[in-house]
């Protein structure tokens, strides 16, 4: 197989320092002279993926595979794009072919592990990552792959250990730092998580993850949605008991409403106060639908908790019923928020388009 041309190395150096637009122009200029060069097509696909043009990147990877079917890097790049496009089964196939072509290269096993994890096949994903690490025990990519697989599988402590090990080798790795910050977020280490996310965004301004930096707001909303449904439902159940069987349950319902409202307010304060102003600043920069759904969810949740407090003070029975009726609306707003995030994310957007095309066919 031929070696990469000079344009490949020039474009790769530009991509390594984050100058993706220049790298893309250099790769395209090289392809103008050698249209079927698999190395350049693979690199172009990689640069487009880093710029979140997943549809264009996949087209480039497909062209690279067609031009040089024995080039393992082309199959790996195709697998990476298929993972981003939420097409895990095809991603596993592409990564498996890359591993077949170059079984001694560790990165192929790591991509295969991520593809398997995307398809929720965690046992095989762990095996693939472990095999890759036997080939390159000090690989930062390998350690971060282990962290990704374990996080997807719900094993946060194992994920944290692997991510920390990766940062011990490469302290400035932006993805490793981001991953540790998000693992801290899942453990409600609010200040530490937000500080780390702020530092990652400062050091990599072109790839700041605004959605991640709003996790305190979104996490509070997620917790309060569940808490409100349970709390209002319990109070309404006690009201029914008081009406039909045991009158003192009405007094107990007021106490429960007050206590649960205080617990939910305390949880919100526990997360939002240490987070500071950064999540609110980032909220304004989110996609329109996601921002509006989140803002409406906050307002509706606050109003519903206020209804529980008002019921505890007045004993007027319609108040908890109205609060309970707000729960389905909150879940609808949650779906709208997810849809807004998906429409902004090129991978999710292309997956939705592909799904719609399948329906039409």
Q: Locations of the language-model features?
A:
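Alpha-helical protein-protein interaction scaffolds
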Residues: 2-217
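Membrane-interfacial entry segments at the cytosolic side of transmembrane helices
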Residues: 219, 248-258, 284-291, 318-319
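Generic detector of multi-pass transmembrane helix bundles and their immediately adjacent loops
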Residues: 285-361
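Alpha-helical transmembrane segments and immediately adjacent membrane-interfacial amphipathic helices
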Residues: 150, 184, 192-196, 208-209, ...
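Alpha-helical linker/edge segments of TPR/alpha-solenoid repeat scaffolds
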Residues: 188-194, 216-237
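Cytoplasmic membrane-interface segments at the C-terminal ends of transmembrane helices
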Residues: 203, 209-225, 268-291, 335-355
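Core alpha-helical transmembrane segments of integral membrane proteins
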Residues: 224-278
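Cleavable Sec-type N-terminal signal peptides
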Residues: 40-44, 224, 231-235, 260, ...
């Amino acid at each position: 197989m031929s070696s990469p041309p000079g344009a490949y190395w020039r474009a790769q150096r530009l991509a390594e320092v984050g100058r993706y637009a220049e790298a893309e122009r250099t790769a395209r200029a090289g392809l103008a002279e050698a249209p079927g060069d698999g190395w350049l097509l693979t690199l172009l696909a990689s640069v487009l993926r880093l710029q979140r043009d997943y549809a264009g990147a996949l087209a480039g990877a497909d062209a690279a595979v067609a031009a040089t079917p024995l080039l393992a890097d082309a199959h790996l790049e195709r697998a990476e794009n298929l993972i981003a496009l939420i097409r895990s089964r095809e991603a596993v196939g592409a990564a498996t072919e890359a591993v077949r072509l170059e079984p001694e290269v560790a990165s192929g096993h790591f991509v295969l592990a991520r593809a398997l994890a995307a398809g929720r096949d965690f046992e095989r994903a762990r095996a693939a990552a472990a095999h890759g690490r036997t080939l390159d025990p000090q690989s930062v990519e390998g350690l971060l792959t282990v962290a990704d697989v374990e996080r997807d599988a719900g094993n946060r402590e194992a994920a944290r250990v692997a991510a920390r090990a990766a940062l011990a080798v490469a302290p400035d790795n932006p993805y490793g730092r981001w991953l540790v910050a998000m693992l801290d977020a899942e453990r409600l280490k609010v200040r530490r998580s937000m500080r780390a996310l702020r530092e990652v965004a400062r050091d990599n301004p072109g790839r700041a993850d605004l959605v991640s930096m709003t996790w305190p707001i979104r996490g509070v909303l997620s917790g309060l949605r569940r808490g409100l449904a349970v709390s209002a439902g319990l109070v309404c159940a006690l009201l029914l008991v008081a009406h039909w069987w045991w009158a003192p349950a009405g007094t107990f319902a007021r106490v429960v409403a007050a206590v649960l409202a205080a617990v939910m307010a305390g949880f919100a304060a526990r997360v939002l106060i240490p987070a500071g102003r950064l999540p609110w600043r980032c909220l304004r920069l989110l996609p329109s639908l996601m921002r509006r759904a989140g803002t409406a969810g906050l307002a509706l949740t606050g109003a519903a908790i206020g209804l529980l407090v008002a019921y505890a003070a007045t004993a007027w029975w319609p108040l908890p019923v109205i609060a309970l009726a707000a729960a389905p609306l909150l879940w609808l707003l949650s779906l709208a928020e997810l849809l807004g995030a998906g429409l902004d994310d090129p991978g999710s957007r292309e997956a939705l388009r592909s799904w719609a095309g399948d329906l039409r066919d």
